[in-house]
Amino acid sequence: MKKKMLEGIEQEVITETLDNGLKIFLMPFKNRKNYSINYMTIFGAAIDKFKVNGKVCTPPSGVAHFLEHKMFEQETGEDPFEFFSKTGSDANASTGYKSTSYTVEGINNIEENLEFLLNYVNSPYFTDENVEKEKNIIVEEINMYSDEPESRMYNESSKAIFKRHPMRIDIGGTEKSVRNITKEDLYCCYNAFYIPSNMYLFISGNFDVESILEVIKNNKLLNEEKNSVAVSVIRPNEPLEVNKKKIEIKLDNVVKPKMIFTLKISLKDLHFKDKYKFVLLTTFIYDILYGSASIFKEEALSDNLFTEFVASKMVIDDFLLIEFMAESSSPEKLKEKIVEYFNNKEITKDDVERYKKTYISSYVLSSDRVQSTLNGVIESVVDYGDVIYDKINIIRSITLDDVLLAKSKIDIDNSSLVIAYSKK
């Protein structure tokens, strides 16, 4: 067991790796009543090809999401959601491109809830019948999301950005791919990726560390000996250049045009803290140039270029995506203004110092919340490979030269624009 503090906020992080490879991260809070648990496998929709003991597997798209659904069906017939409801807790699960998480939040019964969580995630039960039954449910879910403008636009944006990467396909897959999923596909993926050495257990909040570790180490299903497997993920050779510069679509439920303008930036050869620092520097850039207090936003609003505007980022494999999402009657003009500001707007030392204070303040304030602390540690581990304990010191070390150097490495022309117009 190792103990280390998140610097600047004095939050302890206790880490331990079990003999079976499970990596545990505990963040005990003394001044909070609630807790949050996240049991995660590094298996998401972006993994669509892999080797198991030398054999290549290419399951249908959407299998990670399908697997998440089926984990809630137990051979005993017990419903995990019903169990957690009876203990006064909230349970959920989510599949992303990088990972799949099973979560529990509550105030009481943490040991009982943790035991049940470990048991059901380690008890797969897939049959031909229950797999077939689930297909209609998931297809209905896919069709429901395909009618939502934002969901459809994200899918089109991924196709514009990526040429070969699995992110081109929606997390849930397609109706055709879902119809082709078999129980053998589910067991193949489960046995390859739902193994302790590929999983993480994050717990934050009010709990006794020794009692929690005892529950984990004594859980029979988690610690039973399993057949060893050699798994290697096969990544596509994805080029840096975007696949398409522009896509226009027409949708029924769009009134004013919507747009997603995405930059594709290489993170190749950047690892751990260097990778984190570069992503942080890009955050400085888009907050300074396009944030709520920027001249850009003031001018764009004055020119009626948007009614909604937000920027976000995503790290996926060797790429950083920066996305500008807006509702705009003139999406082409708005995109041109974004590019113009990137190329011509000066970033000053005062800008950098102001946002350093903003980021540090935000980090300190969020550290007092159980869920925020948990999410911060999870993001560090999933995106950068380990906990980054000295985030505050990295923020403090940022200089104007750092920001300008990072900006010089961004090719804003390596971008795509997706516009959704009304069909009417």
Describe each region flagged by the PLM:
Residues 1-79, 187-297, 415-424:
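His/Glu-rich zincin catalytic helix
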Residues 74-232, 272-277, 293, 298-424:
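Charge-rich, well-structured scaffold segments of protease-associated domains
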